[in-house]
Regions:
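C-terminal catalytic domain of Rieske-type non-heme iron oxygenases
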Residues: 475, 509-516, 693-698, 719-762
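Extracellular/oxidizing-compartment recognition motifs
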Residues: 2-465, 473-474, 490-493, 510-517, ...
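Alpha-helical support elements that line or immediately flank enzyme active sites
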Residues: 148-152, 162, 342-361, 393-396, ...
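Active-site acid/base region of carbohydrate-active enzymes
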Residues: 157, 227, 232, 247-253, ...
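Active-site-adjacent structural elements in folded domains
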Residues: 134, 171, 217, 388-391, ...
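Repeat-solenoid scaffold signature
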Residues: 191, 200-213, 218-229, 234-236, ...
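Single conserved hydrophobic/aromatic residue that forms the stacking wall/gate
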Residues: 776-785
Length: 785
C-alpha cells in the first residue's frame, strides 16, 4: 500500500461548494505523506452524477499538477450535483482513491428563476436613517422533504430565516458588487429546517452598500431601499418538487431594527421584537403586502468568492475602566487588538434601559476614545432592552476598533458584558513568518490583522471612517503580501470581476471598485493598473490562467486607452487629457501635500511600461504570441520615451526620489550605464536620512526589493530595523496592532496626524510582508506555483 493519501479536495477554491456557475469547474487536491521529496507523477479523476453513473474518467494523466485541473466531462446542468474522487501516483506507487468530494451547480439560466424582487414600502430619504424591513411567507408542504435548497440574494443585506432558525452562517450577505452589472446569490441546504405541514420563510433586510452610507457620498448611491429575491426548491421522496418564490403574496413589517447602516451602526429596540415572526403560528394580520419591484435588476450570479464570516472572538484584556464625562459615567472596554467586526452584548437589564456603544481605534491624551479620524462615520450601536436576560449582536454593520465606550449601563459593568466578534472574508491562512526579533514578528501580526480587517468581500483601504472603499492602488501593492498570508485566489477573482464591471466603455479604469462615484474616471498611475497587476499576481501565486483569459479583453482595452492618452508614450503628461493620479500617495518628500515629490508623469510612464511588460507575459502565458511580441515592442518604446524624458546625459534621474529610483530599477527602465548611478543615488538618499525611507504608497512596496535585488540587502534590513519614524517598526514601538495609514499617524511630539486622513488600519504599507516572506522563499516566483 502506498505511504501517501490524497486530501483537501477543492473545487473552484472551495471545499464542496454548493451553488457554482462555472461550466468547467477547476479541481485541486493535496498529496499528503511523511516522506521527504515525495512528488506526484500522475493522477486520475473520477466524477459521478447523482445516480452514481460515471460522468468523467480522466484516465491516468502523467502530470505533477494538482491545481487548476479543469473538469472535462459532459456539459453540466442547473442544480446538478457531481461527486468526484482522485488517486495519484508517485515514483513508488499509487494511492487509494480519495474520500469523495462534491460540487453542486447553481441556477445557470435566467429562466431557472421564477421568484421576483420584493421590497417594503419606501421610508425616509437620502439623508434619513430608516428601519429595516422584515419579510415573511407562510406555506404548507403536503409531503415529506427529501432535499431542499434556498437560493437567495438581496440588493442590500439579508439574513434568511426558516421556521424560527437562521439559514447559514454567512455575515453581511450577499456582499458588495458593481450593482449596475451583477449581484451574487447564495445557496443553502435547508432540508433539515423544513417539515410537512406549515412552514414559514422569512428575511430581515439591511441597507448595506446598496442603499446605506457608502464611502463619502452619503446614502442611496445605488438604490432607494433594500430588496429581496428568494427561491425555495423542495424535492419530495416521490421525486415531485415544490417551488416557492418571492412575490406579492409575501408580507412585510418593520420591527426592532431601527437603523442598519454599515458606517453609522445599528439601533435595536428589543421592545419592538415580534417573537415568532419567522415561525409557524404567528399572527401576521397587521402586516402589509410586500411590493414587487420591476426595475432594471442586475444579473444574478452564483457566489464566486469566499463568504464573509464571523471568524473569531476576543474578550476584553482588562476590566472596564470608568470615564467621567460631564458627570455622566461611561465605561471603556479594551480588546487589546485593533480589529474589524462588532461586539456581542450579553446582559440582564430592565426594560427600557438603553446602552450606547461607541467604537474607536485609539485613545486621546485624556484616555477617552479618539473618534476625530472617523470623519462622519459614527460607528455607534444602540441597544434598548426589553427586560430580562438578553443577547444582542449587530447583523448589518461592522466597525474598526480596539476600544468600545459604553454609556447607559446601570452601575459598573462586568468584563464579560462585551465580546468582540471578528468579521472578514473566510480565507484560510497559508503562510507565516517568525524570526528572532519580536518587533518584526509583531509587524507581521499587524500586517495579517490589517488584511483581515480590510478584506471584507472587497479589498478596502480602511474599515472605520466614512470611506471603506476598494481602492485599486492599495489592492495591487498589497496583493503579493496577501497571497502569502492567506488563500486569496477566490477573493481576488471576485474583486477582479468588480474591477472589470467598473471599467468605462472607453477602457479607462476607476480608482475604486466597486465604483461608488459612477464617473468611472481614470484612476491614474499605480491605481488603475490593478486591472493588469492583480490577475498577473494571482497567476504567479496560483497558476490561475482562467483569470487572465477571462479579463484579457478588459486588460487590452485598458492598454489601448493608455496608448490614446499618453502623448509620446508619456503617461500622465502635464499636457495630457487624463488626470495625473495620486502620485506617490502620502510620501514624505513632498512640499506638504499628499502626493510626494516624485513627478507624476514619471510614475505614470513607469507603470505604463510595467503594464506593457506584464501584458507581454500574460499574452505569452495564454498562447497569444502575436500580442506578446507587440507588447514587448511597446515596452521597449515606452522605455525609450522614459529614458529620453527622465534620464539625463549624466545618467541621473529627473526627480530622483527614493520612489523614482526604486521604480526605474525594478521595472527595468534604465540604460545599463545609468543603473549604478541611480542605485548609488538611492543608497545615498537613504543614508542621508539616517537609514529612513521617504516613500509613499507607490514606492514603499518596491524599495526593499530594489535594494536587495541590487546587492544591498543590508540597506533594506537597516530600513526594516529602523525604530524611529518614518519606519515600519515605529508604529510597532507605539503599541500598534495593525498597519497605519501614515508613517506619523501619532508621534510623541505632535500627537495625532490630520484627522481627515489618519486611519490606524490601512494595509498599504504592509506590502513589506512580500519582501519579508521572499527571504524565506529565496526569490519572487518566476512561474506559477
Amino acid at each position: 500500500m502506498a505511504s501517501f493519501t490524497v486530501a483537501q479536495l477543492r473545487c473552484e477554491y472551495r471545499e464542496n461548494p454548493l451553488g457554482i456557475d462555472e461550466l468547467r469547474p477547476r479541481l485541486a487536491w493535496q498529496m499528503r505523506t511523511r516522506r521527504r521529496g515525495a512528488r506526484q507523477s500522475a493522477f486520475q479523476i473520477l466524477a459521478r452524477d447523482e445516480a452514481g453513473q460515471t460522468l468523467w474518467d480522466s484516465g491516468k494523466i502523467e502530470s505533477d499538477q494538482s491545481t487548476q485541473i479543469e473538469y472535462a466531462g459532459p456539459e453540466l446542468r442547473s442544480r446538478q450535483r457531481v461527486t468526484w474522487q482522485v488517486r495519484v501516483w508517485d515514483e513508488g506507487g499509487v494511492s487509494v482513491l480519495s474520500r469523495p468530494a462534491w460540487w453542486e451547480m447553481g441556477l445557470l439560466e435566467p429562466a431557472d428563476w421564477t421568484a421576483g424582487w420584493i421590497q417594503g414600502g419606501l421610508v425616509g430619504g437620502p439623508r434619513t436613517i430608516v428601519p429595516a424591513p422584515l419579510l415573511r411567507k407562510s406555506f404548507t408542504l403536503a409531503k415529506p422533504v427529501a432535499a431542499a435548497r434556498l437560493y437567495v440574494s438581496a440588493l442590500g443585506l439579508f439574513e434568511a430565516r426558516l421556521n424560527g432558525q437562521p439559514v447559514g452562517e454567512d455575515a453581511l450577505a450577499p456582499g458588495w458588487t458593481e450593482y449596475a452589472k451583477r449581484v451574487r446569490y447564495h445557496v443553502h441546504d435547508v432540508g433539515s429546517l423544513l417539515v410537512p405541514g406549515e412552514n414559514v420563510i422569512g428575511a430581515l433586510l439591511g441597507d448595506g452598500w446598496y442603499c446605506g452610507h457608502v464611502g463619502f457620498q452619503g446614502r442611496q448611491r445605488y438604490g432607494e431601499r433594500p430588496r429581496l429575491i428568494a427561491q425555495l426548491e423542495v424535492v419530495h421522496p416521490d421525486g415531485s418538487r415544490t417551488t416557492l418564490g418571492t412575490d406579492g403574496s409575501w408580507a412585510v413589517a418593520y420591527g426592532p431594527l431601527l437603523q442598519a447602516d454599515l458606517l453609522m451602526g445599528e439601533h435595536w429596540d428589543a421592545r419592538l421584537e415580534m417573537s415568532g415572526w419567522d415561525a409557524p403560528g404567528f399572527d401576521a394580520a397587521g402586516w402589509q403586502a410586500a411590493e414587487t419591484w420591476q426595475g432594471a435588476a442586475p444579473s444574478l450570479v452564483a457566489r464566486n468568492g469566499p463568504a464573509i464570516r464571523r471568524i473569531q472572538e476576543l474578550a476584553p484584556v482588562a476590566d472596564p475602566q470608568p470615564i467621567e464625562d460631564f458627570g455622566v459615567a461611561r465605561w471603556l472596554f479594551d480588546f487589546g487588538q485593533n480589529l474589524v467586526g462588532v461586539v456581542r452584548l450579553q446582559a440582564t437589564l430592565a426594560s427600557g434601559v438603553t446602552l450606547t456603544l461607541r467604537h474607536a481605534e485609539a485613545l486621546d491624551a485624556d484616555g477617552r476614545i479618539y473618534t476625530a479620524n472617523l470623519r462622519s462615520a459614527q460607528q455607534t450601536d444602540i441597544y434598548t432592552s426589553r427586560g430580562g436576560a438578553q443577547v444582542y449582536e449587530p447583523r448589518f454593520t461592522f466597525h474598526g476598533f480596539r476600544y468600545v465606550e459604553v454609556h447607559g449601563y446601570p452601575g459598573a459593568p462586568p468584563r464579560d458584558l462585551l465580546t468582540a466578534v471578528v468579521i472578514h472574508s473566510d480565507m484560510p491562512p497559508t503562510g507565516a513568518f517568525s524570526c528572532s526579533n519580536p518587533l518584526i514578528n509583531q509587524l507581521q501580526r499587524n500586517i495579517v490583522w490589517g488584511q483581515k480587517g480590510n478584506f471584507v468581500d472587497v479589498p478596502t483601504d480602511c474599515p472605520q471612517r466614512d470611506e471603506r472603499l476598494g481602492w485599486t492602488g492599495d489592492a495591487q501593492v498589497f496583493a503579493p503580501t496577501a497571497a502569502f498570508n492567506m488563500d486569496v485566489a477566490a477573493f481576488f477573482s471576485k474583486w477582479q470581476q468588480d474591477l472589470a464591471d467598473a471599467q468605462h466603455e472607453n477602457g479607462r479604469i476607476p480608482p475604486i471598485a466597486p465604483d461608488t462615484r459612477f464617473g468611472h474616471e481614470d484612476g491614474g498611475p499605480a491605481w488603475a493598473d490593478a486591472i493588469v497587476i492583480v490577475p498577473w499576481t494571482m497567476y504567479q501565486r496560483y497558476g490561475d490562467a482562467r483569470l487572465l483569459a477571462r479579463h484579457y479583453a478588459s486588460m487590452k482595452a485598458w492598454m489601448a486607452y493608455l496608448a490614446e492618452t499618453s502623448p509620446g508614450r508619456i503617461r500622465a503628461h502635464p499636457d495630457g487629457v487624463p488626470r495625473q493620479g495620486y502620485g506617490d500617495w502620502l510620501a514624505l518628500d513632498g512640499s506638504g501635500g499628499t502626493q510626494g515629490a516624485t513627478p507624476r508623469d514619471l510614475i505614470g510612464t513607469a507603470y505604463y511600461a510595467q503594464g506593457a511588460r506584464l501584458m507581454g507575459q500574460i499574452a505569452q502565458a495564454l498562447g497569444k504570441t502575436g500580442d506578446a511580441k507587440r507588447y514587448a515592442r511597446l515596452f521597449e518604446a515606452i522605455r525609450r520615451a522614459f529614458i529620453h524624458r527622465f534620464v539625463t546625459d549624466d545618467g541621473l534621474l529627473i526627480g530622483q526620489t527614493q520612489t523614482a529610483c526604486a521604480l526605474a530599477l525594478r521595472f527595468g527602465l534604465l540604460p545599463a550605464k545609468a543603473r549604478s548611478g541611480v542605485f548609488s543615488a538611492l543608497a545615498r538618499d537613504i543614508a542621508a536620512r539616517g537609514n529612513r525611507l521617504s516613500t509613499g504608497f507607490v514606492g514603499t512596496p518596491h524599495l526593499p526589493f530594489a535594494l536587495s535585488e541590487n546587492g544591498r540587502a543590508d540597506i533594506a534590513y537597516a530600513l526594516l530595523n529602523q525604530r524611529d519614524w518614518p519606519s515600519w517598526l515605529y508604529s510597532v514601538t507605539q503599541g500598534a496592532t495593525t498597519i497605519w495609514e501614515r508613517w506619523d499617524g501619532w508621534t510623541k511630539d505632535k500627537g495625532f496626524q490630520t484627522p481627515s486622513m489618519n486611519s490606524f488600519n490601512h494595509y498599504a504599507y504592509g506590502a513589506i510582508g512580500a519582501w519579508l516572506l521572499s527571504l524565506i522563499h529565496i526569490s519572487e516566483p518566476t512561474r506559477p506555483y
